[in-house]
Amino acid sequence: IFMVDMKKKGISKTLIEVAFPVPETQWQLFFDNVELTEADVLGEVGKGFNILFDTLNPERIILSGLCTGVGRFALKKAVAYANDRKVFNNTPIGAYQGVQHPLAIARCEIEMASLMALKAAWAFDQGLPAGEFSNIAKYAGAEAGIHAVDAAIQTHGGNGFTKEYGIYDLYGLVRLLR
């Protein structure tokens, strides 16, 4: 692995336009005849693959937290909507099990994924091997986030696709992180 000064000759980048809002920008990098020295080597030669994967562990833990946080936000909005939206004799739609169950399942998935992220973070903080836990946390967090946002969209019905309720844009973010 190399740590390269982006100002070196031969390096260029192009912004990648993403179709939905994400918290960071995406770039395509180009390296054309870039000259590197031993000073550019990061870590030990021949160990780059392991170093790369070890550096991904904290990112995976953070992304799990991002996905579960988005899922919690979506569920909070869905529960509020289910309690406010009234049908049939002024009954909130949240009184119906068909609305409750997907939200309850999504909540369980969010909590399980959060616990896995905490386990991965603990292992990483202790200097223990955290790769397996980090991978599980990211997978579980992304799946839980997707299911929670989907349940929130379903709860909102057609309103789940409107800008007013701010639910649908969340789907692209959690789907990207899957």
Regions of interest found by a model, annotated:
Residues 28-33, 54-178:
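Alpha-helical interface subdomain recognition
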